[in-house]
Amino acid sequence: MTDAASTPARAAATTGAGTILHDDDAYTDSLIDFVTASPSSYHAATEVARRLDAAGFTRADETVSWEGGLPRRGYVIRDGAIAAWALPEALPAGAGMRIVGAHTDSPALKLKPSAAVVRSGWQLINAEVYGGPLLASFLDRELGLAGRLT
């Protein structure tokens, strides 16, 4: 029987400082820290930006011309979305690209437009299911509010 920690197929990820993690516990801790810091898509975009900054990426401003070119390693944020890229030193003509995508706004319980209601003397917050949550996972924890007021 082999010890999972001694096998070559171990987890590898990066910390906020861009350090490669080859330790399962450090990988797990980094993921837990990310999830804790990201109760909404807005928080997740901010946390990803913080980690990208620590790894040497540059935030690009969408409101100005990029005539001088994009930063080689950069990102843009709009609302609760973030797009990041890493360009090679030299890009051969006809070279392809790889795009990886994910979204952080689902599953969730989202407030309805008329969220505050009173029923039988109880002040309630009217919410709707967004995405496909495993509802049982919401039953054994305190719920909170996170996001942006508009």
Predicted regions and their residues:
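N-terminal hydrophobic/helix-forming segments and targeting peptides
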Residues: 1-150
